[in-house]
C-alpha cells in the first residue's frame, strides 16, 4: 500500500473525492492484477483454474489500452442495462464479459485505496508491532476469547446477517464512505451489467455469478454493508448503555486485515457501577462476535432481555436498510443446552462436576465443584457430506476412489490428498474430541489408496502391501512439520499433543472442503 501511495502522489483528502479519474490509468490495472494486492485469482493473470467464461487471456497492456480508449470515446455508461438492446451495447463489443470484469477488478482496487490509507494512518507507530504479530491473523484467535468470556454467560442470539435485496441499498450504504459521485455511478453500471436484475445477492444465479467473477468487489460491497450494520453497536455503546469506551475502527474483513489483530473480537463490557444523578445503572455484560455471514450476541441477562435485543435488531434492519428481515433468522438459545455453529465448529458450554478430597488434621471431607467448560466439536455429518459431494466417499462415509485424479502421477495424487487432509486437520485441531477428526483422516487415506490402486489396476490390499507404510508416512509427515514449527524450542510440548487442544494461529484461509457454508 505504501508503494501505491508514493506512486499516486495524492493527498488523503483527494483520495475520497477524486477516485473516478484513476479508472483511466493503466498502472491501476497492473496493480489490480498483482497477486500481492489480490488473493483471488484474477482474470487478467490467466489462471487456468479460474472460471472466466472460458476466456484464459493473458494480462496485456494492449487490452487495457483498448478498454480505456473506449471509455474516452463516448460515455456509453449512460446506456441502461435494463434496455432491451443491452447486448448490442457498442461499448463492450464482442468481449462484454471480459471487458466488464477487467473494469470491475480495476474499480475494486481503486475503491479500496481510501480505506487502506486510513488504516495505515490510524496504525501510526503501532504498524511494525502489528505486522510482526502475523500469527494472530487467524480466525482461531477468536477461541481464547470465547473460552474466557462465554463460560459465565447464559443466553446467546445466533444471527444470520441479512443481505441487501436491492442494488441501490448497496450504493446508498457506500455513499457514506465514498464521496465521488462518478465512482458510484460506475459501480451502479457494473452491478447492473453483472446481474441485469435488482438483486445481486439473494438471487442464486445472479449472486453466484457475481461472487465468482469478482470476489474482491463482492467482498468489498458486502463488508461495507456489514460495517454499516455494526455501526449500531458503537452508537449504543456510547449512548444508551454507558458501555466502557474502547478504541475501535471500521474494520473491513480482508481489506483492513492487520486491524483484525487487535480488534478481531468486539467485546462490549458493561460498567458495573455507573452513577448518574444518584441512580445506579447495572446492565448485563454483552459480547458481540462476527464471522462471515453469522454473528452472535451473548449475554448473562435474562431471556426477556435477549428478546428485547432481538426485536430491536429486527426493527433496526427494516427501517434503516429498508429490507424485510424474517425473525426466524435470529434464534435465542440458552448456552447450556445449545450447540453454537460458529467458525465451522460446534461449540457448547457444559458443566463438568469434579470431586476434590480435602483433609484437615484427622477429618477428611469431599468437595463437589461444578466447572463450566467451553467445548468445540468437529461437525462430522456436514464434513462427510462435503467429502461425499467431492466424490471422496459415499453419503454413509465409506471411502471411494477419485476417478478424475486417476490419470495424474502418483506423487501428484498423494500430494492432493495430503494437502486436503492437512488443511482439515489443522483447521479442526482445536477440537475437544478428536475422534471425528481421525475418521475424516481415515476416509481421505483410504480414498487415496483406492485411487492409486485404481490407477495401477490392482486391489487396495495388494497395493498397500507393495507400498508398505509409505502412504501412511506421507499423511503423518505433514502434521509433524507443523507441530515442529509451532513448538520450535520446547520438544517436550509434543507430549500428550493429541489430548490437548492446539490452535494453529498461522491459518488464514482453508480448503473449500472445510468451509461448510
Swiss-Prot record:
<comment type="similarity">
    <text>Belongs to the intron maturase 2 family. MatK subfamily.</text>
</comment>
<keyword id="KW-0819">tRNA processing</keyword>
<dbReference type="InterPro" id="IPR024937">
    <property type="entry name" value="Domain_X"/>
</dbReference>
<dbReference type="GO" id="GO:0008033">
    <property type="term" value="P:tRNA processing"/>
</dbReference>
<keyword id="KW-0507">mRNA processing</keyword>
<keyword id="KW-0150">Chloroplast</keyword>
<dbReference type="Pfam" id="PF01348">
    <property type="entry name" value="Intron_maturas2"/>
</dbReference>
<dbReference type="InterPro" id="IPR002866">
    <property type="entry name" value="Maturase_MatK"/>
</dbReference>
<dbReference type="GO" id="GO:0009507">
    <property type="term" value="C:chloroplast"/>
</dbReference>
<dbReference type="InterPro" id="IPR024942">
    <property type="entry name" value="Maturase_MatK_N"/>
</dbReference>
<keyword id="KW-0934">Plastid</keyword>
<dbReference type="GO" id="GO:0003723">
    <property type="term" value="F:RNA binding"/>
</dbReference>
<keyword id="KW-0694">RNA-binding</keyword>
<protein>
    <recommendedName>
        <fullName>Maturase K</fullName>
    </recommendedName>
</protein>
<dbReference type="GO" id="GO:0006397">
    <property type="term" value="P:mRNA processing"/>
</dbReference>
<comment type="function">
    <text>Usually encoded in the trnK tRNA gene intron. Probably assists in splicing its own and other chloroplast group II introns.</text>
</comment>
<dbReference type="GO" id="GO:0008380">
    <property type="term" value="P:RNA splicing"/>
</dbReference>
<dbReference type="Pfam" id="PF01824">
    <property type="entry name" value="MatK_N"/>
</dbReference>
Amino acid at each position: 500500500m505504501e508503494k501505491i501511495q508514493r506512486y499516486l502522489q495524492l493527498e488523503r483528502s483527494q483520495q475520497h473525492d477524486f477516485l473516478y479519474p484513476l479508472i483511466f490509468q493503466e498502472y491501476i490495472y497492473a496493480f489490480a492484477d498483482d497477486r500481492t494486492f489480490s488473493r483471488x485469482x484474477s482474470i487478467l493473470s490467466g489462471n487456468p483454474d479460474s472460471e472466466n467464461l472460458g476466456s484464459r487471456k493473458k494480462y496485456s497492456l494492449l487490452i487495457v489500452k483498448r478498454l480505456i480508449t473506449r471509455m474516452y470515446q463516448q460515455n456509453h455508461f449512460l446506456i441502461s442495462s435494463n434496455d432491451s438492446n443491452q447486448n448490442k451495447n457498442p461499448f463492450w463489443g464482442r468481449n462484454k464479459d471480459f471487458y466488464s470484469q477487467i473494469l470491475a477488478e480495476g474499480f475494486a482496487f481503486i475503491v479500496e485505496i481510501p480505506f487502506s490509507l486510513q488504516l495505515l494512518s490510524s496504525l501510526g507507530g503501532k504498524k511494525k508491532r502489528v505486522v510482526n504479530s502475523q500469527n494472530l491473523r487467524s480466525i482461531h484467535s477468536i477461541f481464547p476469547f470465547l473460552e474466557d468470556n462465554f463460560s459465565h454467560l447464559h443466553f446467546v442470539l445466533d444471527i444470520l446477517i441479512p443481505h441487501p435485496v436491492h442494488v441501490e441499498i448497496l450504493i446508498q450504504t457506500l455513499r457514506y464512505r465514498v464521496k465521488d459521485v462518478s465512482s458510484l455511478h460506475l459501480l451502479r453500471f457494473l452491478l447492473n451489467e453483472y446481474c441485469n436484475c435488482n438483486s445481486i445477492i439473494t438471487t442464486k444465479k445472479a449472486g453466484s455469478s457475481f461472487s465468482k467473477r469478482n470476489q474482491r468487489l463482492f467482498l468489498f460491497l458486502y463488508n461495507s454493508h456489514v460495517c454499516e450494520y455494526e455501526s449500531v453497536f458503537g452508537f449504543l455503546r456510547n449512548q444508551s448503555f454507558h458501555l466502557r469506551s474502547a478504541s475501535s475502527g471500521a474494520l473491513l474483513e480482508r481489506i483492513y486485515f492487520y486491524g483484525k489483530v487487535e480488534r478481531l473480537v468486539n467485546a462490549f463490557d458493561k460498567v458495573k457501577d455507573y452513577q448518574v444523578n444518584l441512580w445506579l445503572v447495572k446492565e448485563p455484560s454483552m459480547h458481540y462476535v462476527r464471522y462471515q455471514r453469522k454473528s452472535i450476541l451473548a449475554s448473562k441477562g435474562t431471556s426477556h432481555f435477549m428478546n428485547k435485543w432481538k426485536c430491536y435488531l429486527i426493527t433496526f434492519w427494516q427501517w434503516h436498510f429498508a429490507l424485510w428481515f424474517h425473525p426466524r433468522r435470529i434464534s435465542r438459545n440458552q448456552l447450556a443446552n445449545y450447540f453454537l455453529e460458529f467458525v465451522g465448529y460446534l461449540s457448547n458450554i457444559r458443566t463438568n462436576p469434579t470431586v476434590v478430597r480435602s483433609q484437615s488434621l484427622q477429618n477428611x471431607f469431599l468437595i463437589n465443584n461444578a466447572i463450566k467448560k467451553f467445548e468445540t466439536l468437529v461437525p462430522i455429518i456436514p464434513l462427510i457430506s462435503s467429502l461425499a459431494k467431492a466424490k471422496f466417499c459415499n453419503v454413509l462415509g465409506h471411502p471411494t476412489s477419485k476417478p478424475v485424479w486417476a490419470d495424474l502421477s502418483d506423487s501428484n495424487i498423494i500430494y492432493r490428498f495430503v494437502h486436503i487432509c492437512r488443511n482439515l486437520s489443522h483447521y479442526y485441531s482445536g477440537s475437544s474430541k478428536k475422534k471425528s477428526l481421525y475418521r475424516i483422516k481415515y476416509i481421505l487415506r483410504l480414498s487415496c489408496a483406492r485411487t492409486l490402486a485404481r490407477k495401477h489396476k490392482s486391489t487396495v490390499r495388494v497395493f498397500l502391501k507393495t507400498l508398505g507404510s509409505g502412504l501412511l508416512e506421507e499423511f503423518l509427515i505433514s502434521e509433524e512439520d507443523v507441530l515442529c514449527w509451532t513448538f520450535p524450542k520446547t520438544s517436550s510440548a509434543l507430549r500428550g499433543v493429541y489430548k490437548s487442544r492446539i490452535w494453529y494461529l498461522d491459518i488464514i484461509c482453508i480448503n473449500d472442503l472445510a468451509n461448510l457454508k
